[in-house]
Curated annotation (Swiss-Prot):
[4Fe-4S] cluster 1 binds at residues 312, 315, 318, 372. Coiled coil: none annotated. The keyword Lipoprotein does not apply. The gene is ykgF. Keywords: 4Fe-4S, Electron transport, Iron, Iron-sulfur, Metal-binding, Repeat, Transport. One of its GO terms (biological process) is lactate catabolic process. PROSITE patterns: 4FE4S_FER_1, 4FE4S_FER_2. It holds the Pfam family LUD_dom. This is Uncharacterized electron transport protein YkgF. [4Fe-4S] cluster 2 binds at residues 322, 362, 365, 368. The E.coli ykgEFG operon is a clear homolog of the B.subtilis lutABC operon, however it is not able of restoring L-lactate utilization to the B.subtilis mutant for lutABC operon. Thus, ykgEFG operon may contribute to lactate catabolism in E.coli, but under conditions other than those tested, or alternatively, the ykgEFG operon may be responsible for the catabolism of a metabolite other than (but perhaps related to) lactate in E.coli.
């Protein structure tokens, strides 16, 4: 499995999402609620722009010294009694995780929410080997039951309302209780606790790894990650190679930004720090700890003009403010990484063949630039993708032909002049009362809702020449 979540073509996906009123209402409500809470926390903290500057500096410093910090982290984890595996590709990562599971004769694995494990497709690899995988994040658990991919990096089931969730629980687990969040959460919690107690392995992601101590930081709202790391005898943490902080001082800044940007809170419900396996005399924690550090294309991104995207701390703030995401939801992007960050990172990790449309799923309003806690210039990176695709000839054939025609006309003044005159006359014929009977594909609806400027059949060149002559005459 790749980061691709749908084989449906982009235009069809967009149409399906726009025609889904439940999804659009759910996403709009979530954006409004999270956005309002975020603003309260930003105002409360104060000096927000300075905090953003500091967070961006920390992430830039790590990326510029990534080799040194990866080495330091590896040494510390090993000293703490853990095992470190550097995975160049997603296949390397899943192969190692499967080997650990098979060596432990694991029949069941419990997982906390992790984007990088979604990225490498670890669930499918383990399930194909006959190992049961249980997602323990509330949203991910519901989506797993419904065989539905996540649509947000923080709130995976943002596109579902409680009526749909109850239907899933009823059809998959026989739930007969009321349609209240409290009752449904209690029902799921009771189900998952049985899995926590019987699983041989717990798999988590890693929000940040501390190079100085070899510690892994897990940030959750439900506490399920603590259960995944304390009850099973083996804990496997999977992290993208860029998710490092030098010391706890830097993590303090990043967590401050993460919680406020992700859900509009001072802190998330649970912040868990893990430093190696259980020590002698301790009553909980895993007997064995593995840290899988995943590259999967990140080295190439680091060496490219898109390296700034690796600052990302997966807060989802860009999705929570994006007008395009509001209308098409996460599934419209066809990637586990949706929204503005997905429009940048999906083509880098998954290739332009599958994700060439995503850089165009953006109005370039720059709202994402203004909320990103680590100052990733997302709109500039999206434009950069468009430029790269144009240079590589990946854009639509019709667009390529139009650009060639424009370039040819622009380099032949006589032809350009004739074209401008013809266009001016055509505009005067087809625009009446601010409307035109012509249809222009995707922008037809946009044009119907707006009054077009009246045209008098005169090109700007001829108008300018006429007025210039008049000024000289009056001069």
């Amino acid at each position: 499995m790749s980061i691709k979540t749908s084989n449906t073509d982009f235009k069809t996906r967009i149409r399906q999402q726009i025609e889904d009123p439940i999804m659009r209402k759910a996403v709009a409500n979530a954006q409004q609620r999270i956005g309002a809470n975020r603003q309260k926390m930003v105002d409360e903290l104060g000096h927000w722009e300075e905090w953003r500057d500091r967070a961006a500096q920390i992430r830039d410093h790590v990326l510029s010294n990534l080799d040194a910090y990866l080495y330091q982290l590896s040494e510390k984890v090993t000293q703490n009694g853990g095992h470190v595996y550097f995975a160049r590709t997603k296949e390397d990562a899943t192969r190692y995780i499967l080997q650990v599971a098979q060596r432990k004769n694991a029949r069941k694995v419990v997982k906390s929410k992790s984007m990088v494990t979604e990225e490498i497709g670890v669930n499918h690899v383990l399930q194909d080997a006959g190992i049961q995988v249980i997602e323990t994040d509330l949203g991910e658990y519901i989506l797993q039951l419904d065989q539905d991919p996540p649509s947000h990096v923080v709130v995976p089931a943002i596109h579902k309302d409680r009526h749909q969730i109850r239907r899933v629980l009823h059809e998959r687990l026989g739930y007969e209780g009321p349609e209240t969040p409290e009752a449904m959460t209690l029902f799921i919690r009771q189900k998952i606790r049985e899995d926590f107690l019987s699983a041989e392995i717990g798999i988590t992601g890693c929000n940040f790894a501390v190079a100085e101590t070899g510690s892994v930081c897990l940030v959750t709202n439900e506490g399920n990650a603590r259960m995944c790391t304390t009850l099973p005898k083996t804990h496997i943490a999977v992290m993208g190679m860029e998710r490092i902080a030098p010391t706890f001082a830097e993590v303090d800044v990043l967590i401050t930004m993460l919680a406020r940007s992700a859900v509009g809170a001072r802190l998330t419900g649970y912040n868990t720090w893990l430093t190696g396996p259980r020590e002698a005399g301790h009553v909980d924690g895993p007997e064995e700890f593995h840290l899988v550090i995943v590259d999967n294309g990140r080295s190439e991104v680091l060496a490219s003009e898109f390296r700034d995207v690796l600052r990302c701390i997966r807060c989802g703030a860009c999705m929570n403010t994006c007008p395009a995401y509001r209308h098409i939801g996460g599934h419209g992007y066809g990637s586990i990484y949706p929204g503005p960050i997905g429009a940048v990172i999906s083509p880098l990790l998954g290739g332009y063949k599958d994700f060439k449309d995503l850089p165009y799923a953006c109005s370039l309003c720059t709202a994402c630039d203004n909320v990103c806690p680590v100052r990733i210039p997302l709109s500039k990176l999206i434009l950069r993708h468009r430029r790269v695709m144009a240079e590589k000839g990946i854009t639509a054939k019709a667009e390529q032909r139009a650009i060639k025609m424009f370039a040819y006309a622009n380099s032949h003044p006589g032809l350009w002049k004739v074209g401008m005159m013809a266009g001016a006359h055509a505009a005067s014929w087809f625009i009446n009362g601010g409307k035109t009977p012509l249809k222009f594909g995707a922008i037809s609806d946009w044009m119907e809702a707006r009054d077009l400027p009246e045209a008098d059949g005169e090109s700007f060149r001829s108008w300018f020449k006429k007025h210039q002559a008049q000024e000289k005459k009056n001069g």
